Amino acid sequence: MESCSVAQAGVLTSPFMWRWTGMAGALSALDNTIEDDADDQLPCGEGRPGWVRGELLGSQGVCKDSKDLFVPTSSSLYGCFCVGLVSGMAISVLLLASDFRKLDFSRPEPCFEKEASLWFVAQH
């Protein structure tokens, strides 16, 4: 059974201010990274998806028209997930801290991708 617990909890719970990177398309295609127009440093709001939604959608160009933002409780520090409009088409967008690789997050936990995929299917 896969665990969605957060390792390195002492590091992750610090109030980091992260710049967000948007990854559009398939959730597994993390090498296809697009830098969104995110000039603001956005806090990754652990356990506060409503607050994250307001901050994130106000600053993220690719998700500015999104009505929903999915933040799994177990993985909220790894990133968020939303549906955004790109060239007029609604696509899934995975949002991660731009320095997530430096923080030794090679990719989001598998449970994050699974939960996000199920959420996306339920919304459409």
From Swiss-Prot:
Location in the cell: Membrane
Lineage: Eukaryota, Metazoa, Chordata, Craniata, Vertebrata
UniProt keywords, alphabetically: Membrane, Transmembrane, Transmembrane helix
GO cellular component, one term: membrane
Organism the protein comes from: Homo sapiens
Tissue localization of expression: Expressed in gastrointestinal and immune tissue, as well as prostate, testis and ovary. Expressed in lamina propria and eosinophils but not in epithelial cells. Expression is greater in benign adjacent tissues than in colon tumors.
Topology class, membrane: Single-pass membrane protein
Transmembrane regions: 77-97
Keyword Transmembrane in record: yes
Principal subcellular localization: membrane
Protein name from the UniProt record: Colorectal cancer-associated protein 1
